[in-house]
Swiss-Prot record:
Domain of life: Bacteria
Record keywords, A-Z: Chaperone, Cytoplasm, Nickel insertion
Organism of derivation: Methylobacillus flagellatus (strain ATCC 51484 / DSM 6875 / VKM B-1610 / KT)
Gene Ontology cellular component terms for the protein in this record: cytoplasm
Name of this protein: Urease accessory protein UreF
Residues passing through the membrane, by range: none
Claim: Cytoplasm is one of the keywords in the record: yes
Quaternary structure and interacting proteins, as annotated: UreD, UreF and UreG form a complex that acts as a GTP-hydrolysis-dependent molecular chaperone, activating the urease apoprotein by helping to assemble the nickel containing metallocenter of UreC. The UreE protein probably delivers the nickel.
Gene name in the database record: ureF
Location within or outside the cell: Cytoplasm
General function of this protein: Required for maturation of urease via the functional incorporation of the urease nickel metallocenter.
Keyword Chaperone in record: yes
One Pfam entry name: UreF
UniProt-recorded Gene Ontology molecular function terms: nickel cation binding
Length: 227
């Protein structure tokens, strides 16, 4: 696949139009708003930036990198191990349900793409209970999207969804949403490079405030976002 075509595929994968339901989750941010921790542009940017740095950079992006390499090698065993590792690291019911639902939705979509066949389809069949990052890595590799580009697109999509959630729930205006993107996006290239270079034993999902926020959101009385 040509580089220009891979870029188009990358944009498709990173698009908010990707029908996996990411827009319906706030990943604990809505509880941060309910608690008063997030209440304006500055606090929203701080919350989102911290989660990107600690959780995305320390856990999701490194796992995504491992899944990408497993697809690249055709290593079904490693792919299943990292998929299970990721699901085990989703340490509250809401986060686990989110990843399973998004993974299920992405898998259904991918099965409609006739160009994805052969060894790729065989590995997909051998991946029961697939998480969203495991499938995202697979489609990135199948579409010949470079590992670094795939990770940056994944992080950008997450950031864009978080900014959108803040705009809806704080609420914030569109200019404020763009300021969040400008203020936080600069971290992405550094975090992606660190994720690729990270040793397996350094990967950690330790982000207790995010975990607590997810647990509290499960029973939040009034909410816009899915639990």
């Amino acid at each position: 696949m040509s580089k220009s075509r891979s870029l188009v595929r990358l944009l498709q994968l990173a698009s908010p139009m990707l029908p996996v339901g990411a827009y319906s989750y706030s990943q604990g941010l809505e509880w941060g708003i309910e608690s008063g921790e997030v209440h304006d542009l500055e606090s929203a940017q701080a919350w989102i930036g911290d989660v990107l740095q600690v959780y995305q950079g320390g856990f999701e992006l490194p796992v995504l990198s491992r899944c990408y390499r497993a697809w690249q090698r055709g290593d079904v065993e490693a792919l299943n191990e990292w998929n299970a590792f990721y699901l085990a690291g989703r340490d509250n019911a809401e986060a686990l349900a989110e990843s399973r639902q998004m993974g299920y939705s992405l898998k259904r979509l991918l099965l409609e793409f006739e160009e994805l066949s052969g060894a790729w389809a065989t590995m997909l069949e051998a991946l029961p209970n697939a998480s969203f990052p495991a499938l995202y890595a697979g489609i990135s590799q199948a579409w010949e999207i470079e590992e670094q580009d795939a990770l940056q697109a994944y992080a950008w999509s997450w950031l864009e969804n978080q900014a959108s959630a803040a705009m809806k729930a704080v609420p914030l205006g569109q200019v404020a949403g763009q300021k969040i993107l400008l203020g936080v996006a600069g971290k992405i290239p550094v975090l992606v490079e660190a994720a690729i270079q990270m040793q397996d034993h350094e990967i950690s999902n330790f982000c207790p405030a995010l975990t607590i926020a997810g647990c509290r959101h499960e029973t939040q009385y009034s909410r816009l976002f899915r639990s």
